[in-house]
C-alpha cells in the first residue's frame, strides 16, 4: 500500500504563489482558456473512460480547455507522484492537474498539505449541490473543507445472475451460507483494488453489532477486537470462493466478466446503475439484477481534487465545476452511460433541467432510491489502510 507513513517527514512549506480565485469566475474561465488538464482517474472501465472523453469534448467546446485522461489502476500512484514532486521541490507546473479521489488517498493528501484550495464551495455550481441530503462535505468521516468537489454518489449493491441465484441474500451470513453451498460461484476483486477493499469494509460493517466505532480512527487498542469478526468470516468464506480463493479478479470489470462468462453468479459493485449499463453494453446477461443487504449498504461520494502544484488550476476548476453541472450530472446518471447517483438538489435546478432527470429510466437492473434503503457510513480511512494490509498478509496472492 502506497499510503500514509512517508507523509510524516514532509515538513517543508509549500511555496506561496498567486493562485486563481474561484470567487472571480470570469477571471478563472479567462485564465483557463488554452490550458490543458491532466486528469488522473481510474481507467479500468470503458463506460467511465467514454464519459470522461465526453467531458473533455464539452469543456473544450465551452471553455477552450483541453482534458487529458491519465488512466490509473490505483489512485495511490497519483498521490505518490505529487509527493515525489513535492520532495523534489517541483512546486509549480506539476504533472497532475486533477485527481479522482476519496477516502484514504484524500486524507493523506490533505494531511500532507498537497492540495490546492479551498475552492469547491466557491464554484458556481456548488449552489445546486445537495449539501443537506448528501455526504458531500465529508469524505470517509474526514471534513473536505473545500479541498475536493463532488461529482457522483455511489452505494454498494450486489449483482447477481438470477438464472442461478434467483433471490437476494440478506446479509453476510447468508452470503457465506450460499457460497458454502455453491463453491466457486463468488469472488471479489483483489485488495487493494477499491472494490476489493469495499467488500471487506461492507462485510465488517454488516458483521458488527455496532459499526459506529468505525467512524473513529483505528488504534492499536481497538483494531484487533473490532476486526476479529471480519477475519473469522473471511477464514470461512475464502475456501468457498472462485478458484478456492487462490486467485482473484484484478478489477471490478474483470469480476463482471466472470458473470458474463458464467463462472460466478455474484459480484459487488459501487454503482447502483452499473448492472443496467453493463446489460445495455452487452457486458452482462439480461438475467443480471441487483440487491442490497437488509441492514443497508455503504454509500459515499466521488470527488475530484487539485494538487497544490498544478500548473492549470483555473482549467481544473472549470472541469470540476462542469462535473457538477446539471448537464454532466444527468448524463452520468443515465443508466446506459454510467448510472451514477447525482450530487445535485433537484429543488435547486430549473424545471427544464429537472425534467431531464425525470425522463431518465432506471433500467431493468437498477433499484429505486426506496429499494436502495438506508445508506451506511464509510469507516474512517485508517481502518481500511490497516485492513487491506492485513488482508494481503492473510489471503493475498500474486496477480
Regions found by a protein language model. Give the residues of each.
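Short, low-complexity disordered leader/linker segments with a strong preference
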Residues: 1-33, 399
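Conserved C-terminal helix/tail region of periplasmic/extracytoplasmic solute-binding proteins
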Residues: 20-23, 257, 364-399
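Short, polar/charged alpha-helical segment
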Residues: 22-33, 40, 45-66, 158
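Extracytoplasmic ligand-binding site segments that recognize negatively charged/polar headgroups
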Residues: 42-54, 70-77, 92-96, 100-253
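Hydrophobic residues within well-ordered alpha-helices
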Residues: 82, 109, 255-260, 306
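A ligand-binding cleft/hinge motif common to bilobed small-molecule-binding domains
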Residues: 106-108, 267-285
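Periplasmic-binding protein-like
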Residues: 154, 233-238, 284-305
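Mature extracytoplasmic/periplasmic domains
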Residues: 297-298, 302-371
